[in-house]
Amino acid sequence: MINKIHGKVIEKKESSLVLMTTVFEFELLVSAFCLANFKLSDKVELFTYLYARENELKLFGFLNSDERETFKSLIGVSGIGPRAALRVLSNIRYNDFKEAIDREDVELVSKIKGIGKKMAGKMFLHLQGKLLINNELESSLFGFKELEESIVSMGFDRKIVNSKLKEACDLIEFSNLKDSEKEQFLFKEVLKRMSN
């Protein structure tokens, strides 16, 4: 099984990235959140999942192992195929989806395109208590508490700052930044996201 792919983004499509590795070019179907994180020529590392059926072979790419595990859990739900699972992950971040499932937020989940209340109920039944997040983001935030405090002191809401900081940590998880550069990158990235 292909666990990860390291490569350079040579093409961005509507719902996929084309990566050039040392020898091959791979097209990976990705979530909208994953797609938005990269631009052409970026060097990236994506977790992968190979979906193989008799007449179908598709390679999916993910920001981290948690997003991939959420995808795998979703396709385990009767009636949810890989494209529907990717659509879910394009409409709601995997950690927010886990929270919505755990608290049985029918309204939020059923608003996802192609997921009605009946399918949302099936998801709750199948996934509740089974979506485990590795706390990668939380552990990566541990070293940036001072950064969080400094941004909050600028007058921003702590909850929003924390959320944007988690999003930005998604980016540095697979970046080639040195430790000394990460805080500076996060500071700029969080402020940029706060202003959007």
Curated annotation (Swiss-Prot):
Any Pfam family matching the protein: HHH_5
Region of interest (Flexible linker), residue spans: 139
Subcellular location, principal: cytoplasm
SUPFAM superfamilies xrefs: Nucleic acid-binding proteins, RuvA domain 2-like
Region Domain II, residue ranges: 64-139
UniProt entry keywords in alphabetical sequence: Cytoplasm, DNA damage, DNA recombination, DNA repair, DNA-binding
BP-aspect Gene Ontology terms: DNA recombination; DNA repair
Compartments where located: Cytoplasm
Region (Domain I): 1-63
GO molecular function: ATP binding; four-way junction DNA binding; four-way junction helicase activity
Listed SMART domains: HhH1
Gene3D superfamilies: 5' to 3' exonuclease, C-terminal subdomain (1.10.150.20), Nucleic acid-binding proteins (2.40.50.140)
Lineage: superkingdom: Bacteria
Region named Domain III: 139-196
Similarity comment text for this entry: Belongs to the RuvA family.
Subunit structure: Homotetramer. Forms an RuvA(8)-RuvB(12)-Holliday junction (HJ) complex. HJ DNA is sandwiched between 2 RuvA tetramers; dsDNA enters through RuvA and exits via RuvB. An RuvB hexamer assembles on each DNA strand where it exits the tetramer. Each RuvB hexamer is contacted by two RuvA subunits (via domain III) on 2 adjacent RuvB subunits; this complex drives branch migration. In the full resolvosome a probable DNA-RuvA(4)-RuvB(12)-RuvC(2) complex forms which resolves the HJ.
Domain remark text: Has three domains with a flexible linker between the domains II and III and assumes an 'L' shape. Domain III is highly mobile and contacts RuvB.
Name of the protein: Holliday junction branch migration complex subunit RuvA
